[in-house]
């Protein structure tokens, strides 16, 4: 995918801004444990997709999604004041599936390592057939 430096710079600024807003606290307990993992800004700078992770199960993810949905307007206004942009992109929050995927890969690798450790070593080199 082609990189657009201005979109990348704006994405980095939005990520820092949203992280700062979350750190200071929104007063919404559904978002207390949320972590912003990245921001992708569309080529036309009209939409910023903010990716987040939150510990817990799918109920926690659903609660966080509802929390972000209700806070979108506040976060956008706060960012507009922080970034001083002429036009602020629409903010859309998305759960970062890559984090969960990475955790599942890590779990599989740990299980394979445990199975390997459980196989007794005969101390002999493998025989050739």
Curated annotation (Swiss-Prot):
Instruction: Please give the GO cellular component terms listed in this UniProt entry.
Output: cytosol
Provide the protein's localization.
Cytoplasm
Q: InterPro entries under this entry?
A: KH_dom-like_a/b, RbfA, RbfA_dom_sf, Ribosome-bd_factorA_CS
UniProt-listed PROSITE patterns: RBFA
Mind listing the GO biological process terms from this record?
maturation of SSU-rRNA
Q: Which GO terms describe its molecular function?
A: ribosomal small subunit binding
Q: Which domain of life is it from?
A: Bacteria
Assembly mode? Monomer. Binds 30S ribosomal subunits, but not 50S ribosomal subunits or 70S ribosomes.
Q: Would you tell me the protein name for this molecule?
A: Ribosome-binding factor A
Specify the species. Answer: Desulfosudis oleivorans (strain DSM 6200 / JCM 39069 / Hxd3)
